[in-house]
Swiss-Prot record:
Oligomeric form and interacting partners: Monomer.
InterPro entries linked to this entry: Aspartic_peptidase_A1 (IPR001461), Aspartic_peptidase_AS (IPR001969), Aspergillopepsin-like_cat_dom (IPR034163), PEPTIDASE_A1 (IPR033121), Peptidase_aspartic_dom_sf (IPR021109)
Native organism taxonomy: Eukaryota, Fungi, Dikarya, Ascomycota, Pezizomycotina
Signal peptide start-end: 1-20
Physiological role: Secreted aspartic endopeptidase that allows assimilation of proteinaceous substrates. The scissile peptide bond is attacked by a nucleophilic water molecule activated by two aspartic residues in the active site. Shows a broad primary substrate specificity. Favors hydrophobic residues at the P1 and P1' positions, but also accepts a lysine residue in the P1 position, leading to the activation of trypsinogen and chymotrypsinogen A.
Gene Ontology cellular component list: extracellular region
PANTHER family per record: ASPERGILLOPEPSIN-1-RELATED, BETA-SITE APP-CLEAVING ENZYME, ISOFORM A-RELATED
Protein name: Aspergillopepsin-1
Positions annotated as active site in the UniProt record: D101, D283
Ranges where the Peptidase A1 domain occurs: 85-391
Length: 394
């Protein structure tokens, strides 16, 4: 483990922003997420969301979760319970609102190639106005809850914050399932995992980050997701105003294409730390924290009235409950997830029973630290090494 002090933090992105050099320079920039208009409400299927997270990493979706997902247990509110963080991105001549996902490597978007009934409410990519089609190239993604998307591939200009590339592979949806259509706030996904797991056939394409990182001061991005508020992505530099104390670095395992790493233990509430570490993935595209069964069971033993519900497809408890904090140990650093974040959402509109923000990884062999974990941290994703850095948010 390496601890990186604030005083040594990389702030080259700030200095390059005021550089007067006429030649193209490397840079750093910040892109803010936004909350979509409050009238863009939708229905989320909590067990379906859980199933997608398991299937995304090749996990087995339990039958009880499949059945719960098929029954459509849901809650309806604007931008439900931090389920997604959306970021404006210019693709060709269109501005779209995308989910930045460190657990996948595709840039796919709603497009005007979709049937008109599936376009309603979404901002659309129009490849005919700006793009070059990659003849014979296709993409096809499916998830454990039955949701799917597929289509053609184009080469086009993509701008995120202060950086533009005119040669980015863009996957335009021509077929998409109702689960995606219903979410009118979200126009697609921008993957920030390693390019090795891009799904384009016959040849995988490069992620936006891998395409533009040579333009950045440093080949990294940092994430500050927030609870009940839009978050921020810093590309090319580290903003020391966004964290407290020091950044603790650990090696990232990219062998499976994800931002994987090893933890050194965990603790529940005020209890002592377990020295049993686990392998994990830092994933902004997963909402929940997915852990080994023994850790999940140990956690909910400390939550009054908690039970594993087949009907709901996971652990639930009274919405009036204050769950204990959950702490992940990384070297000498303790990353604390406040218990209120783990009281995730009512299992249905008006219900007094809530779905837990910690659920089983169903024997996946990896733990997934999604947004419930990440919105308590400032996390640095550095492709040099590669390595991950963690610090408490300021």
């Amino acid at each position: 483990m390496v601890v990186f002090s604030k005083t040594a933090a990389l702030v080259l992105g700030l200095s390059s922003a005021v550089s007067a050099a006429p030649a193209p320079t490397r840079k750093g920039f910040t892109i803010n997420q936004i909350a979509r208009p409050a009238n863009k409400t939708r229905t989320i299927n909590l067990p379906g969301m859980y199933a997608r997270s398991l299937a995304k990493f090749g996990g087995t979706v339990p039958q009880s979760v499949k059945e719960a997902a098929s029954k459509g247990s849901a809650v309806t509110t604007p931008q439900n319970n931090d389920e997604e963080y959306l970021t404006p991105v210019t693709v060709g001549k269109s501005t779209l609102h995308l989910d930045f996902d460190t657990g996948s490597a595709d840039l796919w978007v709603f497009s005007d190639e979709l049937p008109s009934s599936e376009q309603t409410g979404h901002d659309l990519y129009t490849p005919s106005s700006s793009a070059t089609k990659l003849s014979g190239y296709t993409w096809d993604i499916s998830y454990g809850d039955g949701s799917s998307a597929s289509g053609d591939v184009y080469r086009d200009t993509v701008t995120v914050g202060g950086v533009t590339t005119n040669k980015q592979a863009v996957e335009a949806a021509s077929k998409i399932s109702s689960e995606f259509v219903q979410n009118t706030a979200n126009d697609g996904l921008l993957g920030l995992a390693f390019s090795s797991i891009n799904t384009v056939q016959p040849k995988a394409q490069t992620t936006f980050f891998d395409t533009v990182k040579s333009q950045l001061d440093s080949p990294l991005f940092a994430v500050q997701l927030k609870h009940d508020a839009p978050g921020v992505y810093d590309f090319g530099y580290i903003d020391d105003s966004k964290y407290t104390g020091s950044i603790t670095y650990t090696d990232a395992d990219s062998s499976q294409g994800y931002w994987g790493f090893s933890t050194d233990g965990y603790s529940i509430g005020d209890g002592s730390s377990s020295s049993s570490g686990f392998s994990a993935i830092a994933d902004t595209g997963t909402t929940l924290i997915l852990l080994d069964d023994e850790i999940v069971s140990a956690y909910y033993e400390q939550v009054s009235g908690a039970q594993e519900s087949e009907e709901a497809g996971g652990y639930v408890f009274s919405c009036s409950t204050n769950p204990p904090d959950f702490t992940v140990v990384i070297g000498d650093y303790k990353a604390v997830v406040p218990g209120k974040y783990i009281n995730y959402a009512p299992i249905s509109t008006g219900s007094s029973t809530c779905f837990g923000g910690i659920q089983s990884n169903s024997g996946l062999g990896l733990s997934i630290l999604g947004d419930v974990f990440l919105k308590s941290q400032y996390v640095v994703f550095n492709s040099e090494g590669p390595k991950l850095g963690f610090a408490a948010q300021a």
